[in-house]
Amino acid sequence: MAMIFEVRVGLRDSDAGQADITRCVLVNAGVADSRIIEQYRADRCTLSWYERSRAQADMHARRIRSLKLKGAVVSVAGIKDADWTTRWKKYFKPFNITPDIRVVPLWTKHARIPAGSIPVYLDTTFAFGSGLHATTRMMAGFLRRCRGRRGRFLDIGTGSGLLALIARAYGAQNVYAIDIDPVAVKTAFSNCKANCCAFEYLKSVSFEDFRIKGQFDFVAANLLTQDLIRLQKKLVGAVAPGGYLAVSGIFHDNYPLFSRRFSSRALVRVAVAHEKKWYAVLFRKRAPAVSPLSRQGQVSVE
């Protein structure tokens, strides 16, 4: 039986900032914030997440212990892979991620769907993207804002496939989704089947290695700040003129850096969302200017 490893960090809730410090250290070490479950009980706050490698779990535990946070208790425990789903079900219940999209755990598929809600069925298993995290919710909000603009959609770091499924529900005709984690891609494929749909492209590949053919009407990138800055040229190039680029995963301490470094004359900032110390930004790519000479010879049909 395969094992996964739960890392738990118990903190004093009364010590302001401990949870934020811990999250920031973990995110900077490569743990996606959407994987971290935060619970409060009495005067304690507990952060927990799961790793498939014991060495990786121990490395993160040592990193947190090295912070020497007062009253912090760090532990690593192995659990059977099959037990992960049972544990996760305690935290994951049906909810509306936007006013008209309802995320429904697959194990509650027969639950009543409120009138006016579009269900998106999800089995997160070990992948990211349950929709419970602020970054995912803000991106879903941007998708709703741009709904009805049919075309090609690219989801970078798709995780469970949730944003790609929402894009499809909002009218995207061609959906492309990539993730560097093959486990996430496998989960996204299962979620496609659960929703009786298919993506035009779903593969395990990094964005750096992704060979872009054509441009997209909407590109969603939920990545760390430094990765967004490093990849901005390719991100901007992937967007069709008049199309949208939505980025999130920007921790509030990094937002000033992002604002300075992520800039392109080709982009117009349309909206900024801020929730629970996380930022997301929606850009629109400028359409190329048409010179007076290029207008000569054009025929107008009324």
Task: Give names to the regions the model predicted.
Residues 126, 130-212:
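Conserved SAM/SAH cofactor-binding pocket of Class I
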Residues 180-290, 299-302:
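S-adenosylmethionine
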Residues 6, 102, 119-123, 179, ...:
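Conserved beta-strand segments that form the floor/walls of ligand-binding pockets within enzyme
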Residues 2-113:
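N-terminal auxiliary segments of SAM/dcSAM-dependent transferases
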Residues 30, 147, 239-241:
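A generic alpha-to-beta junction signature in SAM-dependent methyltransferases
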Residues 94-134, 140:
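Proteins enriched for Cys/Gly/acidic motifs involved in redox and nucleic-acid/cofactor modification
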Residues 99-101, 151, 243:
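Surface-exposed loop/turn positions
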